[in-house]
Amino acid sequence: MFKFKKKIIGFILPVLVLCLLTACGKKKEKYIGDINENTITINEDGSIREIACENFSDTNFDISGLKDDIKSDIDKYCGSDKKGAVKLLEYKEEDKNVRVAIDYKSLDDYNAFNGTSYMNSQDLLAFGDVALRDMAGNDIYVSGIDTSVAAYKIFSADAAFTLNISGEIVYYNGHVNINSSNSARFDGLGNAVIIYK
């Protein structure tokens, strides 16, 4: 009987030590990573992930309570009828640089929480007959796009940030710099517009 207990302990003890050394269990996911500029991601289901980056080194702004302020604003917004509409995922503070990852259930929640009026629509003419370029650099107006080819969406914003989408950018205007087929940089100098599928 003693040998049997010794064998069990001899087996279980190393497994427990191994679990402790390798941090057995769920590791906390890193959302921000090395992102250091404002980034918005539109997921396939229409939800939004924002990485907001701000440098407060040139201001006298006291950032010591900023995380609590953000949590409080989220709690106020969500209340009882919008439970889970906005979630703080990660908060990083290094020197006077603050980076925050926040999830939003929809663009409507993003706009309401942030006081913005970004638009994402299947109505391509929602912004008028805007002049755009295709990915080859050819000029086209929205009215000239053949909507029978694909289910397009149009996104517009007037701020500087990187936009990532679950899809493929097909057309864009002069306030957009293309990073890849699913990522673009909005310059913040005017109303940036992309059409994607």
Describe the predicted segments one by one.
Residues 25-27:
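Bacterial signal peptide processing site
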